[in-house]
A protein has these predicted regions:
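Helix-loop-helix
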Residues: 2-297
Length: 297
C-alpha cells in the first residue's frame, strides 16, 4: 500500500476543492435572511425554472447539482407534506454518497481504534529530531497503517468528495418553491427561527425553539456515536489513552455543534429539518457500517 503523494498532487486537489466550493457559494438570501425571489426554483407554471435557464443565468454547479435536487423536493411535495419531502430527498442524497460514506466511516473508525498505538509510537520518538529517528517513526506508523489496511490520504479524499452533494442539498432545500411557501405543523419553512423565537415566542416561537433543541441533540448524538463505537472495541488500557486523545476531538465536536446551532437559528427553518434528518441518518449509517464492515474484520 502506497501512502506517498506528491505535494503537487495535494495542491491540485486542494485547489480543485476550493474552486468547487466557491462555485457553489452563490448568494441566495437577502438582508432579511429570506430567499431572494429570483433564486426560488419553481417546478411548473409561468415561473418554471428550467435546467437551461439555471445553467445560463447561474452556473454549471447550480444546473448539475442544485436544480435536480430542488426539483425533486418540489415533485415529492405534490404528494406529501414539504417537510416529509425534504426528509426523503435528504435520505436519497445520503444514499447517493453511501459508497464513499462506507469507505470514510470504516477508515475513520479504524483510525480511532489505532490512535492509542499511534500515540505510543509518537511518544517513543518524542524529542528525537534526527533524520534516522524520524524515518524510523514514519516506518512504524506505516507498518501500523498497513496492518489495519488504512490509507489516511484516501480517508481525506473520501471525506471531501461528497461536498458538492452537501452544498447542493443545502441550497436546494432552501430554494425549492415548495419549501419557500410551505409549512409543517404551523412551522413556516422559510421562517428564521431566531426571528420567530424573539418576536412571537408565546404564539409560535416556542415551537421553533423546540426544533432547535431537537437539532442540537441529534447533532450531538451523531458526532459522539463514532467515538463510542471506536472505544467499545478497545482494551481497557487503550480506552484510557483514547480518552486523552479525544479531548482535542471533543473540542472540535463542541465547536462544530455550536456553529451548526448558531447557523440553524439564522437560516430558513427547512435547514433545521435537513440537519436533524442528516444527523439521524449519519448515526444509523455509522452503526450499521460498524457492524457490517468493521466488527467483522
Amino acid at each position: 500500500m502506497n501512502f506517498k503523494f506528491s505535494k503537487k498532487v495535494k495542491r491540485l486537489l486542494t485547489v480543485a476543492l476550493v474552486l468547487l466550493v466557491l462555485t457553489g457559494c452563490t448568494r441566495i438570501t437577502g438582508e432579511d435572511g429570506k430567499i431572494l425571489a429570483e433564486k426560488i426554483i419553481y417546478l411548473a407554471g409561468d415561473n418554471h425554472t428550467t435546467w437551461k435557464s439555471m445553467f445560463t443565468n447561474e452556473s454549471w454547479f447550480g444546473a448539475i447539482f442544485v436544480w435536480p435536487l430542488a426539483q425533486l423536493v418540489n415533485f415529492f411535495a405534490q404528494y406529501m407534506n414539504v417537510a416529509l419531502s425534504v426528509i426523503l430527498v435528504t435520505i436519497l442524497s445520503r444514499l447517493i454518497t453511501l459508497p464513499l460514506t462506507i469507505k470514510q466511516t470504516v477508515q475513520s473508525q479504524k483510525m480511532q481504534m489505532i490512535q492509542p498505538k499511534l500515540n505510543k509510537i509518537q511518544a517513543k520518538y518524542a524529542g528525537k529530531e534526527d533524520e534516522q529517528s524520524k524515518m524510523a517513526m514514519s516506518q512504524e506508523m506505516m507498518n501500523l497503517y498497513q496492518k489495519y489496511d488504512i490509507n489516511p490520504f484516501a480517508t481525506i479524499i473520501a471525506t471531501f468528495i461528497p461536498f458538492p452533494i452537501m452544498i447542493a442539498i443545502w441550497q436546494a432545500v432552501q430554494r425549492a418553491e415548495s419549501v419557500v411557501f410551505g409549512e409543517f405543523l404551523t412551522l413556516k419553512m422559510e421562517a428564521l427561527p431566531m426571528t420567530e423565537i424573539t418576536t412571537n415566542f408565546l404564539t409560535s416561537g416556542w415551537k421553533y425553539l423546540i426544533l432547535i433543541v431537537i437539532l442540537g441533540i441529534t447533532q450531538f448524538a451523531s458526532m459522539k456515536v463514532p467515538q463510542y463505537l471506536a472505544q467499545k472495541n478497545m482494551k481497557e488500557r487503550e480506552k484510557k489513552a483514547a480518552k486523552e486523545a479525544n479531548k482535542q476531538t471533543n473540542t472540535m465536536t463542541y465547536s462544530m455543534l455550536i456553529m451548526i446551532v448558531f447557523m440553524s437559528v439564522s437560516m430558513p427553518t427547512a435547514m433545521s429539518f435537513y440537519w436533524i434528518v442528516s444527523a439521524i441518518v449519519q448515526a444509523v449509517q455509522t452503526v450499521l457500517i460498524q457492524k457490517r464492515y468493521v466488527d467483522n474484520e
